[in-house]
Amino acid sequence: MDGNRRYAKKNSVECTVGHYKGFDKLSECLKWCLDLGIPQVTVYAFSIENFKRSKKEVDALTELAKEKFQRLLDEIDQINEWGVRLNVAGRLCLFPHDLQVLISKVMLATKHNNKLQLNIAYAYTGRDEISRAASHIVDGLKQKEISPDDVNEHLMSQALDLGEPDLLVRTSGEVRLSDFMLWQISNTVLYFTNVLWPEFSIWNLLAAIIHFQRHSPPIIEEKENSPVIEKFLKKLEDTKWQQLEKIVAC
């Protein structure tokens, strides 16, 4: 979702207005994806590096996030009717506790939905995600939940917050990955467009999908996990939900 600030500058409005337009565009884009039967969408909403921006902008983005997640809670019945599951990936501990609570409530309230999963990379970088996944695996080795023979790139992929995308779209003319899903995109089709995110249209989305259809690689058959790996991964998943419940309870 790149280009919010440039959109604001282009239209001579405050940066905050550009970010609001960007969030509105996300809602619109999700409806298109639901109509098209796309089962999973991942957006890069806030990098850990974004904390280096001015305090005014970071505070404004935090308040915007609180407003939007509260709105999601207020409209949770509609979201559940649509079958949308929300998953926020990143270091939530870097945000104020009240925002952590809102995010946790939305994730818990939508955890059983299965029509479309919306992954929001928030307080996220690809390198940090890899670091945390490696830490989980090291802990598993220390606790003897897995053995050194179990550790391979397949296990690493499954220990990450986010799965492997088929298509990655970057808006606003940038041709960098900006530390996004670095491990997962080895087989991903990349699509770059000059369109600013708030101006992204259904036609831009369809153009990206056609690009994917023309360049999509052969489907790779997924490997089956051993019972030991399945148990380890289930523990990671259960721990995540327990942490969210703990945040809400505090």
Model feature map: region roles:
Residues M1-C250:
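Flexible, compositionally biased loop and terminal segments
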